[in-house]
Structure formats: structure tokens, C-alpha cells
């Protein structure tokens, strides 16, 4: 019997941590995956209470016919999530965040380091619950970077499970050289989606205040998932601040699938690991 793929869920037992568990629960049914709960403690004396809380959560999952296990890790959550993901051979990490303000306060600059240090894709969620129908509407910001093609491919692969419509949103760039590079990524998306019978749309947004306009459009479309590449060499970097951080902590509380550069350059594929 083949071993089920693992979804790793770091939890801190807060409402947003509970939201991550809820998302993972729904995804585990769709992807036929096992859930691995993780709680990291800095002091050994905190381990027994954490272990007890995790065992209670496992009991709730098992009542719902979800295969689950858990463990307590000594260390630092920012450094150890990637290590645990490797050890458990996790194929997806579902993690909660408290939004941009909370993320800056609680996690600071290390928030994206958690993702950057792992070759496993993350789905970062806030308190907003996952819809029963799942990720029916997926949105992707497109710039000139070649890794965006992998983001489009990931969106298509996960979207297959939900018969999703995919919305491509690109930057309207006045510089002809950059504009040509951005436009080069559009035909790839069209060909991939059309060949596989996926409904899609393509929309351009002015470069000025792209991040906030992108989030506003995502909310207007009632998006269920945003897909991005965690790449500091993209056009979005020049908009000021961290584009990735703004999207991850978006005010509409839309979940974000984040693929880092390590994964985007590897052979990782949802199709390979989740069928």
C-alpha cells in the first residue's frame, strides 16, 4: 500500500492556527493526504502541555476519518518548519498568519524566511474559512520573471481538483523591454490552460499601486486562492515594500499558495505527489 502524501500544519493553538488545521482537513480529503501537526516550543517544560493539545486535535481529526499524527519540536518555528517538512517528507505546508500587521509584529522579516528555506510549497491562510467548494477561483499575478510559468502550472494543477477558473493578472508596463518580457509569459498561460480545457481570463493592471489594486480585484472576483512565486528579483519588488508580504497578509484574507525559488526550479509538482 502506497504511503499517503503528508500535509504539514504548524499550529500555535490560536484561531488562525485552527483555521490552518481546518484548511488542511478539507484539502486532505480532496488530495487523499495525511495531516502532520507540528508545534514548536522554546522550552522543554512547555512540551507536555503542547503534546496534550496536539493529541486532542488528533482525536478530533480521527473522528472525521482523517489520518493524522503530530509531534512537538524543540527549537524555533522560523528555522524548524522547513527541517521538519524535510524529515516528514511533507508535500504541502498549510500555515496560518495574522495578516500583515500581525505578521510584522509576530514574525517580522523571518515570516518569508520560513518559506524561502523550504522547497515545499505553502498555503498561507488567515481566519477566513475555506469554502465548501474549495478553490474555484484562482488568481495569479504575472510579471517578466520566468518562474511565473511555474506559478501558472501550480495553479492549473491544484485547480484541477476544483474545476477552477484561473485569472491571469499582469502588470501594464510602459518600458517596452520589460513589457515584452511580461507579454512573453501570457501565451504560455493561454496555451497551457486552453490545451487542458481550463476557463480563464486575462486582465492588466497599471503598475502604480499594483499590490493593492491586485488585492482589490481578487476580492471583487471573490477569489479563493492567490498563487505567487516568492522571488525578490521580480518587478513587484520595485513597487515599494515587500509585495509577497502584502499579498500573504492581504486584507481580503484570501489564502495564498506560495512557491519559493527552490521549488520553482525543481521537479516538484502537485500532479506527481497528489495524483
State where each predicted segment sits.
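Rossmann-fold cofactor-recognition segment
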Residues: 67-70, 202-203
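A conditional alpha-helix N-cap/helix-loop micro-motif detector
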Residues: 17, 74, 104, 148, ...
Amino acid at each position: 500500500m502506497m504511503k499517503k502524501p503528508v500535509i504539514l500544519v504548524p499550529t500555535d493553538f490560536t484561531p488562525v492556527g485552527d483555521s490552518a488545521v481546518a484548511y488542511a482537513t478539507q484539502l486532505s480529503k480532496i488530495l487523499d493526504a495525511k495531516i502532520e501537526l507540528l508545534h514548536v516550543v522554546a522550552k522543554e517544560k512547555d512540551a507536555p502541555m503542547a503534546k496534550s493539545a496536539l493529541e486532542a486535535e488528533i482525536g478530533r481529526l480521527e473522528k472525521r476519518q482523517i489520518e493524522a499524527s503530530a509531534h512537538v519540536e524543540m527549537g524555533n518555528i522560523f528555522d524548524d518548519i522547513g527541517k521538519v517538512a524535510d524529515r516528514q517528507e511533507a508535500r504541502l505546508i498549510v500555515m496560518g498568519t495574522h495578516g500583515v500587521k500581525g505578521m510584522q509584529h509576530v514574525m517580522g522579516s523571518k515570516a518569508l524566511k520560513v518559506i524561502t528555506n523550504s522547497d515545499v510549497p505553502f498555503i498561507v491562510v488567515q481566519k477566513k474559512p475555506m469554502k465548501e467548494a474549495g478553490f474555484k477561483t484562482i488568481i495569479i499575478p504575472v510579471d517578466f520573471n520566468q518562474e511565473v510559468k511555474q506559478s501558472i502550472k501550480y495553479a492549473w494543477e491544484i485547480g484541477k481538483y476544483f474545476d477552477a477558473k484561473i485569472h491571469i493578472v499582469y502588470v501594464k508596463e510602459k518600458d517596452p523591454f520589460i513589457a515584452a518580457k511580461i507579454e512573453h509569459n501570457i501565451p504560455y498561460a493561454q496555451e497551457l490552460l486552453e490545451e487542458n480545457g481550463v476557463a480563464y481570463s486575462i486582465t492588466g493592471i497599471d503598475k502604480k499601486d499594483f499590490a493593492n489594486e491586485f488585492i482589490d480585484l481578487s476580492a471583487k472576483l471573490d477569489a479563493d486562492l492567490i498563487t505567487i512565486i516568492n522571488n525578490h528579483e521580480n518587478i513587484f519588488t520595485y513597487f515599494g515594500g515587500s509585495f509577497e508580504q502584502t499579498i500573504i497578509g492581504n486584507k481580503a484574507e484570501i489564502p495564498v499558495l506560495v512557491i519559493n525559488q527552490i521549488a520553482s526550479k525543481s521537479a516538484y509538482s502537485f500532479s506527481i505527489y497528489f495524483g
